[in-house]
Swiss-Prot record:
Homodimer. It catalyses: (6R)-5,10-methylene-5,6,7,8-tetrahydrofolate + NADP(+) = (6R)-5,10-methenyltetrahydrofolate + NADPH; (6R)-5,10-methenyltetrahydrofolate + H2O = (6R)-10-formyltetrahydrofolate + H(+). One of its GO terms (cellular component) is cytosol. Pfam families: THF_DHG_CYH, THF_DHG_CYH_C. The gene is folD. Pathway: One-carbon metabolism; tetrahydrofolate interconversion. It comes from Christiangramia forsetii (strain DSM 17595 / CGMCC 1.15422 / KT0803). It comes from the Bacteria. This is Bifunctional protein FolD.
Amino acid sequence: MTILDGKKISNDIKDEIAGEVTKIKKRGEKVPHLAAIIVGKDGASMTYVNSKVKACERVGFESSLFRLPHTVSELELLDKIEELNENDDIDGFIVQLPLPPQINTQKVLNAVDPDKDVDGFHPTNFGKMALDMTSFIPATPFGILELLERYDIPTKGKHTVVIGRSYIVGRPMSILMGRSGFPGNSTVTLTHEFTKNITQVTSQADIIIIAVGIPDFLKGEMIKDDAVIIDVGITRVPDDHAERGYVIKGDVDFENVSKRASFITPVPGGVGPMTVSMLLKNTLLARERHHKRAVDAKK
């Protein structure tokens, strides 16, 4: 069994991006600029956004953080998004989720300029991804693809089972694993909470990608020997014996599943670190496309 070390691969990617930024600086060009909007003071969201800011500093990006109160109106948030859409200095930006109940999340995500949508959540980018066109791939699925590629895990002709159908992970993964190329060319089964006899499905899978937010959902008896297991889940489970009062658990019963798997991602340290690095990679791509448009406009 091989651990898919997302932390190591994530650091490798950051080093590669930092190298590209050095080249950009040597050419006297503007470095990539990533911005984030965060609404309220949700602890997990704050931690995630702060990790993005630190990652930007490490690779040499500019970063901007816009904090809005929990009471912000939908119109005020949309105005801030439009402001960032029109700011030529910003190459890409994200709106940190979740948003408070007075705000329509889909309406907000739809308001982001697709050319700056480095989270890859805009319908334009999702549609382009489904059609194998140039787009921004959502950061978590992008990170999973990168792990599969860097560990040279075969996907062609394999049966991939995706558990969970969110637009952030499950649905894009089902599209990406079935597309032409590598990683891809899999036969994909997309499952969810209404799938009957799910063990019958998972036990036939060569690759399982799970993102349901239920700790230890995938058990050892639910997989076949030598399956590849990608665990996207991350849940804080109360634990009186833990220093922080909780432990982090994934969707996979790691102790038992790892005994049968050929490759497996740990939680933490697997998919999580990859998400931030791929957000940076999307921002670098956004900057390159932005720069090309600016150069072409001067011709």
